[in-house]
Amino acid sequence: MKFVDEASIYVRAGKGGNGALSFWREKFVAKGGPDGGDGGNGGSVVLVADEALNTLIDFRFTKKYIAESGEGGQGRDMTGSKGADLEIKVPVGTTVIDEDTGETLGDLVRDGQKLKVAQGGHHGLGNTRFKSSTNRAPRQTTKGTVGEERTLKLEMKVLADVGLLGLPNAGKSTFIRAVSSAKPKVADYPFTTLVPNLGVVKVKKHQSFVIADIPGIIEGASEGAGLGIRFLKHLVRNRILLHIVDLAPWDEITPAEAAVIAVNELHQFSPALAERERWLVLNKTDMVPEDELEERCQSVIDALGWEGKAYRISAISGEGTEVLCLDLMTALDEKRELLLESPEAREKEKAVRALIDEEGRNRIMSLREKRRKAGLLLDDDDFDEDDYDVEVEYVS
């Protein structure tokens, strides 16, 4: 199944049923009163988060969703049937945007969470409603109103506590294999990771966190090079970013240069995302001669102007990964407690995520517009083989 994290759909709620014009007719009742019933309300369109889904690919093929209209009223004060609501299942982690106004309608972040995106039309009134002491035989009715319609943009972002950032072949996939049961593809060539991979890291009994590996970014990614920029948005919901630096790169670039490139591209994509809490992880210590290790690590720290702790690990052997995961669990627990106890912290987190969303979306749309003008992108979308047949799933 292809991994698709964006889609546009058209939704229209059902029309309300018209009110009925009717009078009671019965043997020996010459002038029965009005008995026209109301129409039924139109069905609404509702999105429902489903944790069993992990891609928006279905919306690439079915783009129109129309809810059922309400039925018209009938005589004998019979109300028309209400149109059934149309429920559309989307993956957990889907952001819903009104494509015409740019307004974010909501985030579906919990399994079973619902979001009404188009309100059904209101029912029309039958002539019974207009009976009065001065008008015993009203012929007035009203029609049902039309339902709301919208063009929606759906954006799916994977839900993870920790996100991995780095250049291709930095060892991100090897790291996620080492600390969880996830088994992303690993090989000695760039862009082995083509879509996000998720793994559940179990630190202690009943203590775990989710980690996300996205395709590596390269120099010029913010201008459209490589695969990484379209996946950087998946880091929006991460509480901590792990910047993994390869101490033994296979090409001519130095570890210090690689570290600076990743940070610069992150800033270009979203300054707010670049300000997220970020930890430095120096990987492949086992592949560096012992007499060169200290100097190589220090070169990265100096190039970044890094003042915090720098973790030294070997993802392939597991050296240093246990301490790193324990520290991550402690930090994440502290962040969860703060969000639970402080409304101000929750509001701040919400505002930061919204800002990252806006900055990232604007950047991606700007690049797509440039590609369209250059004739590199079709008018409908960019659905191509870059998506690949890989599923994103939580593996514990």
From Swiss-Prot:
State the GO CC annotations.
cytoplasm
Q: Which HAMAP family match?
A: GTPase_Obg
Which molecular function terms from Gene Ontology are attached? GTP binding; GTPase activity; magnesium ion binding
Q: Where is the composition biased (Polar residues)?
A: 129-144
Q: Which InterPro entries is this protein grouped with?
A: G_OBG, GTP-bd, GTP-bd_Obg/CgtA, GTP1-OBG_CS, GTP1_OBG_dom, GTP1_OBG_dom_sf, OBG_GTPase, P-loop_NTPase
EC number(s) recorded for this UniProt protein: 3.6.5.-
- Which segments constitute the OBG-type G domain? 160-333
Sites binding Mg(2+) sit at S173, T193
Gene that specifies this protein: obg
The name of this protein is GTPase Obg
Coarse class of the protein's main subcellular location: cytoplasm
Sequence ranges assigned to domain Obg in this UniProt record: 1-159
Described purpose of this protein according to its UniProt entry: An essential GTPase which binds GTP, GDP and possibly (p)ppGpp with moderate affinity, with high nucleotide exchange rates and a fairly low GTP hydrolysis rate. Plays a role in control of the cell cycle, stress response, ribosome biogenesis and in those bacteria that undergo differentiation, in morphogenesis control.
Keyword Nucleotide-binding listed? The answer is yes
Provide the residue positions that the database annotates as binding GTP.
166-173, 191-195, 213-216, 283-286, 314-316
Subcellular localization is given as: Cytoplasm
Q: Which GO terms describe its biological process?
A: ribosome biogenesis
Stored SUPFAM superfamilies: Obg GTP-binding protein N-terminal domain (SSF82051), P-loop containing nucleoside triphosphate hydrolases (SSF52540)
Q: How does it assemble?
A: Monomer.
